[in-house]
From Swiss-Prot:
Main location: cytoplasm
Subcellular location field: Cytoplasm
Molecular function per GO: DNA binding
Domain of life of the native organism: Bacteria
Record GO cellular component, one term: cytosol
Gene Ontology BP, a term: regulation of DNA-templated transcription
PANTHER family, sorted: TRANSCRIPTIONAL REGULATORY PROTEIN YEBC-RELATED (PTHR12532:SF6), TRANSLATIONAL ACTIVATOR OF CYTOCHROME C OXIDASE 1 (PTHR12532)
InterPro entries named among the record's database cross-references: Integrase-like_N, TACO1_YebC-like_2nd/3rd_dom, TACO1_YebC_N, Transcrip_reg_TACO1-like, Transcrip_reg_TACO1-like_dom3, YebC-like
Keyword annotations: Cytoplasm, DNA-binding, Transcription, Transcription regulation
Family, as annotated: Belongs to the TACO1 family.
Organism the protein comes from: Borrelia garinii subsp. bavariensis (strain ATCC BAA-2496 / DSM 23469 / PBi) (Borreliella bavariensis)
Record's protein name: Probable transcriptional regulatory protein BG0025
TM stretches of this protein: none
Length: 243
């Protein structure tokens, strides 16, 4: 079975991490700050902060940067108010996009997103036009070059997971949102994950040829180049030669 679209995109982009490290860190710091501001600075009692910090660690963000972002969040309003916006959109060939943003200027972000979509052959949808194609699940990813598949499956099943998907040397453990923290804590006693969060997962994925898929990937990357765009979730089945 093929891998989850979101992780495939993240994995594919890891080779270019150094070139975009500052931009990635900017997005992560913003997410950590907002999470701490909303739910407090305790990673154990703030699930959103825990996920944000985990992402930062996977991206090799220095511990000092993470701590500063948390302190900034719990320090209160410092004159900049951020808004969370999720745009629902269509890329070419009917690919659905969920564009998650954190912005201090809604008009600017809306204009930027619309412009990139239009130039890439996509369009903004109405609320509800795309979101019904996705559902929330806990997603934990392991590198099978580091661990044995059977070992991960044994422990994951013992933890009570919903599903395990294996492809391209990765094992993707799927849980219900409610069981995510429990399962992750159990698996952490044995394995170190590559990625872990409660994510939007597509009900069905769209398969395209390499040329078409490259066009969609380019559009997603252009959207994610904006600091205001935290991530773009999609239902594209990424061809193996592009993963």
């Amino acid at each position: 079975m093929s891998g989850h679209s979101k992780w495939s995109t993240i994995k594919r982009k890891k080779g270019a991490l150094d070139a975009k490290r500052n931009k990635i860190f900017t997005k992560l710091i913003r997410e950590i700050t907002i999470a701490a501001k909303i739910g407090g600075g305790d990673v154990e009692s703030n699930p959103r902060l825990r996920v944000a910090v985990n992402k930062a660690k996977v991206a090799n963000m220095p511990k000092d940067n993470i701590e500063k972002a948390i302190k900034k969040g719990i320090g209160g309003n410092e004159g900049v108010e951020y808004f969370e916006i999720t745009y629902e959109a269509y890329a070419p060939y009917g690919v659905a996009l969920m564009i998650k943003c954190l912005t201090d200027n809604k008009n600017r972000t809306s204009s930027d997103v619309k412009s990139v979509l239009a130039k890439g052959g996509g369009s903004l949808g109405t609320p509800g036009s795309v979101s019904y194609m996705f559902y929330r699940k806990g997603l934990i990813v392991y590198n099978l070059e580091k661990y044995l598949e059977d070992e991960i499956m044994e422990f994951a099943l013992e933890a009570g997971v919903e599903d395990i998907l294996v492809s391209n040397n990765e094992a993707e453990v799927i849980t219900s949102p409610d069981d995510f923290d429990k399962v992750l804590s159990f698996l952490k006693t044995k394995f170190k994950e590559e990625m872990a969060e409660v994510a939007l997962i597509p009900e069905n994925k769209i398969s395209l040829n390499k040329e078409q898929a490259e066009k969609i990937i380019l559009l997603i990357e252009k959207l994610e180049d904006f600091d205001d765009v935290q991530e773009v979730i999609h239902n594209l089945e990424i061809p193996e030669e592009l993963s």
